[in-house]
């Protein structure tokens, strides 16, 4: 863990935000934080713990009184890095707001991971505290004992008791993984192993009979079934051969009957087919003539259409010729009119255009004349305004000079001598200090009275809380005894259930043997009943059967045997589940008891009374005992739930009371210290005020404190009046200079305006002469309509002449084009008519030629004789199919006659053959099923036999695994292993610290660990005598604690993976002489090579002179400015 930056604002004496750059500060390995006493050096460490854990250890209630009295908000921000393979940075931000004079509340809290971008990991105070402790693996107590050592905490690790020191080392060196976590892991594995064992026992019980004798019996049954199957197969094959022969004759006979019926049906259909063939011939003839009939009818239609079109074209040609002649005459007449009118209009247009230009110039000249007159009037007005303003400025300047003279005389009368001012100032300062001291004494006395009332209430509350805590301890002891009693009941129930389960397994084995013996006897009896005298036995092959033997060996199956086996199987399954449930409850009670002892250490001495009587169902029959056990277990479960809930509630209330008592003690201690401090302040203030009054009387015998204040006020009034005079004189100097400059500027403006006025007058006269010349040129044209209107009229007449000519020309061209089109259509229609007549003659000749040998004479008959193509195709297909069927049926009759060759089969003979085959097939199928059932039964028994053996082997392995886990649980019970590791780690730290201490004390002292885990000193200078650490002097305690802290910091790995890269000291250097101080600083300077930065907080000047990099803490100022920090390099 490496610090990067720390920002502080509003904490203790800090007001403005101050940022400390640790990266630049810790580059040399060792750096110092220096400043006078009370400047705020220790507040830097407070800011670090406040940012990380939200607490200031030396503050009451961890946060009371930490906010600067002149601020309403406090903010801290700490950025640090954790170095693994690659460095990851984190930033913790906290902002607090004031709630009253002492208390603050969290306003903002964030924990940020800094990589390529910032990621907020937590934004609530509790979550941030949890994430910081998880990341670092240190509580605030660990942090202030091993990393950041504030005032009063330096020697705490040295004096910690053994158990508390071991717990701290467990967290510092991440030893929890070898303690509770390892025990829980072993317990979980043991629970899983027992569950697996119970599952296998239940599975083994459910397999039923799986002995080797059962396998052999099943194999014999399978051999008998195979022999029967072979006999049935031969019988079925013979029946199949006879069936195949009769089936062929029967099927051919049925086929012949079908062909004879088909022959009769075809003979009845023959007349209809003949009619269809005649109609088909007529349709084919009409189809051949249709193209000629269509061409003939089309030619007649085209000839009629061509005659109509030719008539219309001739009429259109005559109309277009008359229209063209009319347009040609109109165009020629307008051309003649244009040639006469156009020259006259063009001459008039040119004259009007020149006069229009003159008219525009005249208008512009008149506008310019008006502008010049307006400018002239403006200049005259501006000149008058400047002259008026010049008169006003001159008057103000005179009055200002007179007032300045008066102010200078007044200032001279208000001046105070330096001696008078000095005496007055001394008297006022002494009077102010006396008044301030009086007010402070009143304020502190009031605070003292309020604190005494608060302390009285707190002591009353403390007495009540002590009584409540003692009562809660007694209740917890009673509840814990109840928990232990329930635990013993659970253990007794578990042992009884184990014994009952063993008895049930024995009973199950006996029942299975009885069932197998009864099944063999029953099979023997059934086989003996089926034997016939003189025939061989299918099992042994003997022909001599002794009925007495089967009767003698037959056993009647017990009707209750199967029911007893099922009951036993169910009981074992339920017993396994109940055993698992009891084991879980037992483990849960053990864990709960451990937690209760951890939360309430006084419970370690409490032991529950042993139960003398065992469970009441031990000597009952198995089934009754199991029902009793289930009933008892339900009652015990209720007891477990009851005592667990009751115990948890009591411990919660007890811990809450302890927490309240601890908080109350802290508050009482703080308030007592605060009351003592206030009394001391009041005494000091009273002494200071008496001394100040005596000094005032000696210095100013003729004045009282009140008169001194009034004297100071009088001088201050004179000073304020003189200051006001000086300000007014300064303003008057600027005022007079400004008005003098303004007066000169106004004079220049008046001269300039006079010149501009004359220039405008002359320009207006010149423009008036130009206007007269333009009006003379226009003459009479300026009267009546404007020249622009006359010019627009002439231009409109010229435009009309051209547009009308163009329009008539376009109409003439259009008429010409339409005339040409009409001529083309007339010629084309004449040609089309001649061609239509020729085609008609050819089509008529072709029609007559092709119909002369047919019965069709008119084109209409062709359409009447035609048949649609799909219907025609259907008729052809029907005729072809009929002919094919006729031929095929004759061939089939011939073929079946050859196959039968005179053979015949009656229906009764065929039915007998079918029945015989079915009977043979049924017998063969029954034999197959019988063999399959026997084979399946054999396979099931073999699988069960194999699985039974596998489970037996696995049970042995699991039992060995459970035994090993039980041994490990016994070894790791309690925290002995973790304590061993912590002691080893402590020995390592002590060896390293002893080497450092030996160097610091010139081989005089060494440190060792005693048998109880505490530290003792070895005085090598006095023959190795051991001394308790409590006998050390202040300087010796500092050196020993420093050695331990450096050794601990060098070995700490946060969460077992992050190296600790910094260490802070905040006391102790003042107890060292010059030689020891040099030795300590030299040792600290050597730490740079160990990748460990050490920060030293001190006010010792000799230490400040030795360190190359220093952070200087400047104390707060009376003006209100807060503590500031600055970096100083050697």
Swiss-Prot record:
CDD domains: ABC_sbcCD. GO terms for cellular component: cytoplasm; DNA repair complex; nucleoid. The keyword ATP-binding applies. ATP binds at residues 35-42. InterPro entries: P-loop_NTPase, SMC_SbcC-like_nuclease. It comes from the Bacteria. Residues 115-135, 179-270, 344-530, 652-904, 940-1004 form a coiled coil. GO terms for biological process: DNA recombination; DNA repair; DNA replication. It is found in: Cytoplasm, Nucleoid. Its main location: cytoplasm. Keywords: ATP-binding, Coiled coil, Cytoplasm, DNA recombination, DNA replication, Endonuclease, Exonuclease, Hydrolase, Nuclease, Nucleotide-binding. Pfam families: AAA_29, SbcC_Walker_B. One of its GO terms (molecular function) is DNA exonuclease activity. NCBIfam families: sbcc_Bac. Belongs to the SMC family. SbcC subfamily. PANTHER family: ABC TRANSPORTER ABCH.3. SbcCD cleaves DNA hairpin structures. These structures can inhibit DNA replication and are intermediates in certain DNA recombination reactions. The complex acts as a 3'->5' double strand exonuclease that can open hairpins. It also has a 5' single-strand endonuclease activity. Heterodimer of SbcC and SbcD. This is Nuclease SbcCD subunit C. The gene is sbcC.
């Amino acid at each position: 863990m490496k610090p990067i930056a720390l920002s502080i604002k509003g904490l203790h004496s800090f007001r403005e935000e101050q940022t400390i750059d640790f990266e630049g500060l810790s580059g040399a390995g060792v750096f110092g934080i220096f400043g006078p006493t009370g400047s705020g050096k220790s507040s830097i460490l407070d800011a670090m713990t406040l940012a990380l854990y939200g607490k200031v250890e030396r503050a009451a209630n961890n946060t009371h009184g930490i906010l600067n009295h002149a601020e309403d908000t406090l903010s801290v921000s700490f950025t640090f890095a954790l170095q693994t393979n690659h460095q990851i940075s984190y930033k913790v931000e906290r902002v607090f707001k004031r709630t009253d004079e002492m208390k603050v509340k969290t306003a903002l809290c964030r924990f940020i991971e800094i990589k390529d971008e910032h990621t907020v990991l937590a934004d609530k105070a509790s979550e941030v505290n949890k994430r910081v402790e998880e990341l670092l693996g240190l509580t605030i107590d660990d942090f202030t004992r091993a990393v950041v050592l504030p005032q009063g905490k330096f020697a705490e690790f040295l004096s910690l008791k053994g158990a508390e020191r071991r717990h701290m080392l467990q967290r510092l060196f991440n030893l929890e993984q070898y303690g509770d976590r390892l025990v829980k892991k072993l317990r979980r594995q043991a629970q899983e192993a027992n569950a697996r064992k119970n599952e296998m026992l239940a599975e083994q019980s459910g397999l039923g009979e799986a002995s080797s004798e059962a396998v052999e019996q099943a194999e014999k049954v399978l051999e008998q079934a195979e022999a029967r199957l072979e006999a049935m197969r031969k019988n079925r094959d013979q029946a199949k051969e006879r069936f195949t022969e009769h089936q062929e004759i029967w099927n051919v006979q049925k086929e012949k009957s079908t062909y004879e019926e088909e022959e009769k049906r075809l003979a009845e259909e023959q007349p209809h087919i003949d009619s269809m063939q005649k109609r088909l011939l007529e349709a084919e003839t009409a189809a051949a003539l249709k193209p000629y009939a269509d061409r003939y009818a089309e030619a007649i239609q085209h000839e009629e259409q061509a005659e109509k079109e030719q008539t219309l074209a001739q009429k259109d040609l005559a109309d277009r010729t008359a229209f063209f002649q009319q347009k040609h005459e109109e165009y020629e007449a307008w051309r003649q009119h244009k040639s006469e009118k156009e020259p006259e209009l063009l001459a008039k247009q040119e004259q009007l255009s020149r006069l229009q230009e003159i008219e525009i110039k005249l208008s512009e000249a008149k506008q310019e004349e008006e502008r010049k007159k307006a400018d002239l009037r403006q200049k005259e007005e501006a000149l008058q305004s400047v002259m008026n303003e010049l008169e006003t400025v001159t008057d103000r300047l005179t009055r200002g000079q007179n007032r300045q003279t008066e102010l200078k005389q007044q200032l001279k009368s208000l001046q105070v001598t330096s001696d008078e001012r000095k005496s007055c100032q001394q008297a006022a300062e002494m009077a102010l200090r006396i008044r301030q001291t009086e007010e402070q004494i009143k304020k502190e006395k009031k605070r003292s009275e309020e604190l005494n009332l608060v302390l009285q209430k707190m002591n009353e509350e403390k007495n009540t809380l002590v009584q409540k805590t003692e009562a809660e301890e007694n209740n917890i002891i009673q509840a814990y005894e109840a928990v232990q009693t329930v635990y013993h009941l659970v253990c007794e129930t578990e042992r009884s259930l184990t014994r009952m389960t063993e008895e049930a397994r024995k009973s199950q084995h006996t029942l299975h043997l009885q069932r197998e013996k009864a099944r063999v006897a029953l099979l023997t009896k059934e086989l003996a009943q089926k034997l016939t005298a003189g025939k061989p036995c299918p099992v042994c092959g003997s022909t001599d059967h002794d009925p007495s033997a089967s009767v003698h060996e037959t056993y009647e199956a017990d009707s209750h045997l199967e029911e007893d086996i099922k009951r036993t199987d169910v009981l074992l399954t339920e017993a396994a589940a109940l055993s698992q449930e009891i084991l879980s409850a037992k483990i849960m009670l053990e864990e709960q008891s451990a937690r209760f002892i951890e939360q309430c250490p006084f419970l370690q001495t409490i032991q529950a009374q042993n139960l003398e009587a065992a469970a009441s169902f031990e000597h009952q029959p198995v089934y009754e005992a199991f029902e009793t056990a289930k009933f008892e277990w339900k009652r015990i479960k209720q007891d477990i739930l009851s005592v667990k809930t009751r115990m948890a509630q009591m411990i919660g209330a007890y811990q809450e009371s302890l927490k309240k008592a601890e908080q109350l003690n802290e508050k009482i201690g703080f308030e007592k210290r605060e009351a003592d401090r206030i009394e001391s302040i009041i005494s000091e203030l009273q002494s200071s005020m008496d001394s100040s009054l005596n000094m005032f009387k000696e210095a100013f015998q003729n004045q009282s404190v009140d008169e001194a204040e009034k004297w100071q006020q009088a001088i201050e009034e004179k000073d304020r009046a003189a200051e006001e005079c000086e300000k007014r004189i300064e303003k008057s100097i600027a005022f007079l200079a400004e008005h003098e400059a303004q007066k000169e500027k106004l004079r220049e403006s008046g001269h300039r305006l006079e010149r501009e006025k004359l220039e405008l007058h002359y320009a207006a006269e010149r423009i008036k002469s130009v206007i007269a010349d333009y009006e003379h040129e226009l003459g009479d044209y300026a009267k009546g309509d404007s020249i622009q209107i006359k010019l627009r009229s002439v231009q409109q007449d010229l435009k009309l002449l051209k547009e009308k000519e163009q329009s008539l020309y376009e109409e003439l061209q259009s008429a010409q084009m339409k005339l040409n089109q009409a001529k083309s259509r007339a010629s084309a229609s004449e040609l089309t008519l001649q061609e239509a007549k020729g085609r008609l003659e050819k089509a008529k000749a072709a029609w007559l030629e092709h119909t002369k040998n047919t019965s069709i004479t008119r084109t209409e008959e062709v359409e009447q004789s035609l048949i649609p193509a799909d219907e025609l195709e259907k008729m052809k297909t029907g005729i072809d199919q009929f002919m094919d069927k006729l031929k095929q049926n004759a061939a089939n009759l011939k073929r079946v006659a050859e196959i039968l060759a005179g053979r015949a089969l009656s229906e009764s003979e065929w039915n007998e053959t079918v029945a015989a085959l079915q009977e043979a097939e049924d017998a063969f199928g029954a034999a197959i099923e019988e063999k399959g059932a026997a084979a399946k039964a054999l396979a099931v028994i073999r699988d069960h036999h194999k699985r039974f053996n596998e489970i037996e082997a696995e049970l042995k392995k699991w039992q060995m695994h459970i035994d090993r886990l039980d041994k490990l649980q016994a070894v790791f019970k309690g925290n002995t292993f973790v304590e061993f590791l912590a002691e080893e780690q402590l020995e390592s730290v002590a060896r390293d610290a002893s080497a450092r201490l030996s160097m610091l004390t010139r081989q005089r002292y060494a440190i060792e660990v005693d048998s109880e885990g505490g530290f003792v000193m070895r005085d090598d200078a006095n023959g190795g005598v051991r001394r308790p650490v409590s006998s050390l002097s202040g300087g010796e305690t500092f050196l020993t604690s420093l050695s331990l802290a450096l050794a601990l910091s060098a070995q700490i790995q946060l969460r077992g993976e992050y190296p600790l890269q910094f260490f802070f000291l905040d006391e102790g250097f003042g107890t060292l002489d010059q030689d020891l101080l040099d030795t300590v600083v030299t040792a600290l300077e050597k730490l740079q090579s160990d990748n460990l930065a050490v920060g030293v907080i001190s006010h010792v000047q000799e230490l400040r002179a030795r360190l190359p990099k220093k952070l200087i803490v400047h104390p707060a100022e009376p003006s209100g400015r807060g503590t500031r920090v600055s970096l100083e390099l050697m």
